[in-house]
């Protein structure tokens, strides 16, 4: 059973993280992944990211620390060379040269091209949704794995799957701030959103481009990221769960690790090379570059680097925010997630079809629950809150030491402190109100009704997420429900969410929701709705507001009844966000000046944009134990039980016992490596990030961290922070010896015996 005790670190987790939504003009600060928006739908406030400005003293920056922007590579050249980089450091800042031109995003995971035929390498857990979507009790690809022997055998990925190829990154700070400098509140928010919309609209005049504007350093900088959006994504190869998820929840975030967390997609385009939806006549995409596979792997002490799209870090948050999260919000979130996971287990027990339908949801719940538990334990271990308080005290003292600085920044600091206190006071109530989103059909009804309302406006005036550019995502999101929904289970989970919401005092609850639900039972909702039928649900995408108001569907009626209240709350939040954004930008100006006064360079918090990080292969000492940097194939046999989470394929066990490793033996180990540790600095969203050696060659995939180190989202500590990578030699050996993926190996330029 899951528990919420800090010491209990159970459940599976990975580094998957949906990238920040494009509707934010501030840095992403909401720490709730999109998959949990139905569990914790907190206020859509820019405060969360805006107030993250004070901690992480630049004097504490370590050599391995940093999720660096490509534009910062010039100033890091000497450090990179000293660390062991053999490439020209300038290549790491050039989107038109490898390795960066081979790096791709999946929207929530990172990836990279490994062949000229659009073959994309990522983590096994990043393709779990596609495995689940294509699985059935008769063809259980989640359990047994999948290999397409030919291009024609490749399966469509889950609806909404994308491969994004980055084409341009440009500084648009002046354009974003035009007309906003003297504004505050809602006026400032609206101006920033209008500027953002105009920039994106201009960028997306090129067909099949997906553009967004992200804030860095608290809004001191804004950069536009332009990507080619590839819409036809197909599943090529995923090893069995006994490889890709070997060790499951028990081994998750743990070392030693023996998980082969890797899989392959392929990107397809129309015959003329343009991006197009799935069609039989489509052809493999030809990337500008792809990563070469290293002939030799890495060894202890080697320089490595990782490029990807880290989702969110909180290192620039204030000490008071850290205290609130670790003492109040995180304990509540972990308890709710633990109960949620237990409930899904209970409701799907003995029902294979239901278990398949909820597999991806459960994996995500387990992911986030364990991470929160690890963050709390890690914060205690390194005295995170106390360290942040001490660091922040130095920053504040620096401001007060100079009357000019006090006059310039003092008022903004005080305003930010006030806004943080207000936000913290409401955060737990926000989380409980968010529990109403546990029901998928209620969530679908709300989205559909919002879509209808937004469609009545000119496209440029619609809320981001509901514009014409978002139609495909909206459509595919509605389609995906079909494979992830069982009515009785949805009803039970929604009932649990409503029960938790009702623990709030009346003045904290939604008056509109309570009024509508009075005297109604949930069974009547599911008996009378047609939203569980995909075809019927999709019809609502084209209906008007009047159609919704005339509907007799109870979920639609509830969405209509609560809409005005939700919009009024959103309007207040937008006004507040504009105020926060102005204060935070000024404070961040001070923060950057403070760093410069110490001769230090800062990097911005992760926000889903392209970053690179570097470090070395190394183990560590933990509580009297020494962690060596590599695990080996023999460890798989030692852990193998033939059941549950430790059920490796029979063929793999036979090959290991026979020591049939071919040319994939690491000379210094005398055997086949499986996973390895490093000091590179990553977080959620880096799942699937290619690991490169000093020459820019592919040597593996980052897929996890150690439980002691997940606190690095808030503070990097080189003593405890370690990233776990699957070794390319284990990947290639599994493909060749276990699954017979010779055609893929040949495509990647790997010669088999």
Residue ranges of each PLM-predicted region?
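Short alpha-helix boundary/capping segments
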Residues: 1-11
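Short helix-onset patch at the extreme N-terminus, typifying the N->h transition
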Residues: 7, 47-50
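Low-complexity, intrinsically disordered segments with a bias for serine/threonine
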Residues: 14, 25-28, 49
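Short, Lys/Arg-enriched N-terminal segments with co-localized hydrophobic residues
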Residues: 22-41
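Terminal presequence/propeptide segments associated with secretion/organelle targeting
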Residues: 30, 43-46, 58-753
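Bacterial N-terminal signal peptides
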Residues: 49-57
